[in-house]
Each structure stands twice: as structure tokens, then as C-alpha cells.
Amino acid sequence: MHERIRKILVLLPCFLIVSVTCGQSSKTQTASFPLDSVAGLELVNAKVEAISYRGRTAIHLGPLPGRENSDEAAIAILKGSDFKDGTIEVEVAGAPRAGAAPDLRGFIGILFRVQSRGAQAEDFYLRPTNGRSDDQLRRNHSVQYESAPDFPWNRLRKESPGVYESYVDLDPGAWTTMKIEVSGTKARLYINRAEQPCLIVNDLKLGDSHGQIAVWAHATTEAYFSNLTIK
């Protein structure tokens, strides 16, 4: 199946900009990754270029020549990130590459609490072409949670139909804001700055863990990322 992908790591040692804002009794630290340059990137089985896409500076993540139709993914890990609880927000734009098979959806998403170079990770991702489909069942599968290594999307769908995926309006190729709030074993996914989450997970499969943060896309996706922040 196309979504049972072999995730290929692409290391992204991005420039880290840290700002601190003070509240009445606590401090909130924000780490910003502009994702606007290829400088300092270590690439594995992928290519990355810095471009301007739909009015934003961004990185374009894609497969190596000859791998455009493979059932693989490129993952970009944010070097130096160590995340347990908090908020991750990033701008993404994804759509199937021209000529991709009709059952491909433009898979694109965020990994968090990443360990062992992606062997373990929590994952929220989008299926952009499902968001405005005329097929209601496809619309219900617009966003997805999964967890590596033991809980891929198809196992979760079989064992708990409708629990780990949901509908949200998505426009393929358009900039989309993904925000994930994580606390302990719970996580919430928000799209395009909505006040309410489109997907709630109350039992993250890796438990109350920690690890790195990454962005990823399927080899058949035209994928763009910009302005990632961690709070």
C-alpha cells in the first residue's frame, strides 16, 4: 500500500533562533526554524532547494532523480530539537506530483518525539486531495495520526475505525498551517488557525516520551515547508 512507506531520513540542521517571553510566573521559550535556506542541510536519498512558493520563502523537499514514483518518504529532522510537551506549528503545502497514481493523496506531515533516526515517532499528516473530494468517506480521511513502529495508519483504521483520522477542509498545493499541541499522552491537531482541533488523540502510542521533530512527505508529493516554530 502506498502509505506503508519506508521512511528515508533527510537530516535538516536548520538555523535555530530562540526568543524568550516572560509571563507572570513562567517563561515560554520559542524556537524558530525559518526553513528558508538549504545551508547546513545533510541529505539522504532526497534533494532540497530553497525557493519562493506562493509568496513565501520555503524549502522544497523531493526525492532523488529516478525515485519520483517510489513508495518512499523523505524525512527532514530538525537537528538540535528535543521535544516532549508543547506546541509545534509549521506552514506546509502538498499535492500529488504531476503523473502520480490516482490513489496518491499528496501525503505531507509532521513527526514528533522522534527517536532512533525515525524508527520511533508520533505522526500527524494530511491527505490534501481528500479534503474536497465528492466521496464522503475520503473526506473523512483528510487528516491522520499514526505511530512508528507498531501503529501504522492501516492498523489503526482496521482496529479503531474513525478514531485516528478525521475531516478538515484542505486545498491541495495551498499553504496550510498545521499546529500540534502535545501534553503527556495526548495531542491535538489544528488546521489553518482554527479555534477547535480537527483531530484529538488521547492515547499517543509511544506514551509520555520525548524526541526530535521532523517534517516529511511521500516521494510522489510536491512538498513545501516554511516557518516552523516550537513552544
Question: Predicted regions span which residues?
Answer:
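Bacterial N-terminal signal peptides
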Residues: 10-19
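Extracellular glycan-recognition regions
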Residues: 24-231
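Bacterial N-terminal signal peptides that target proteins for export
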Residues: 1-10
